[in-house]
């Protein structure tokens, strides 16, 4: 049986009505998150209703980009060929200074230097047709 490898492209975001402003801010390298206009809680991922007070009012606010590493996993075997060149890579949960936790990739940090609680900052990686946030050292 002949095994064929096909070139895969990196999956990108599919913005919807709730997330379009977020993805636009990421593309501009200036991340903004929703903030509830009633309780002033920042939230991620964008939603129509605040998970804290159930208000439907929100605005978009720039975030500092400061974060700390909450958890991580080093992926040695990518699930698709699109990530093969980057393997092993780090999938991280980071807690932003404004409160929300988000999943991203931790880049430019040697694996042996990764530590829970380490200070990070949000940066951006541009791909063909889209931009993703990543975490790096400050």
Where are these regions (language model features)?
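A broadly conserved sequence feature marking short terminus-proximal activation segments
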Residues: 1-31, 137-138
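Well-ordered alpha/beta subsegment
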Residues: 4, 99, 103-138
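Short, cysteine/histidine-rich loop/knuckle motifs that typically chelate Zn2+
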Residues: 35-38, 49-55
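Short, conserved beta-turn/loop elements at beta-strand boundaries and strand-helix junctions
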Residues: 72-77, 126-128
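Short, basic/aromatic beta-hairpin or loop at an interaction surface
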Residues: 86-102
């Amino acid at each position: 049986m002949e095994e064929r490898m096909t070139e895969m492209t990196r999956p990108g975001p599919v913005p919807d009505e709730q997330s379009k402003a977020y993805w636009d801010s990421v593309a501009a390298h200036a991340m903004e998150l929703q903030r509830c206009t009633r309780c002033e809680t920042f939230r991620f991922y964008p939603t129509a209703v605040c998970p804290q007070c159930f208000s439907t009012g929100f605005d978009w606010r720039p975030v500092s980009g400061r974060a700390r590493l909450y958890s991580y996993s080093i992926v040695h075997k990518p699930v698709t060929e699109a990530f093969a060149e980057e393997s092993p890579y780090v999938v991280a949960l980071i807690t932003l200074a404004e409160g929300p936790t988000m999943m991203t990739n931790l880049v430019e940090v040697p694996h042996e230097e990764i530590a829970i609680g380490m200070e990070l900052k949000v940066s951006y990686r541009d791909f063909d047709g889209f931009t993703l946030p990543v975490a790096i050292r400050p």
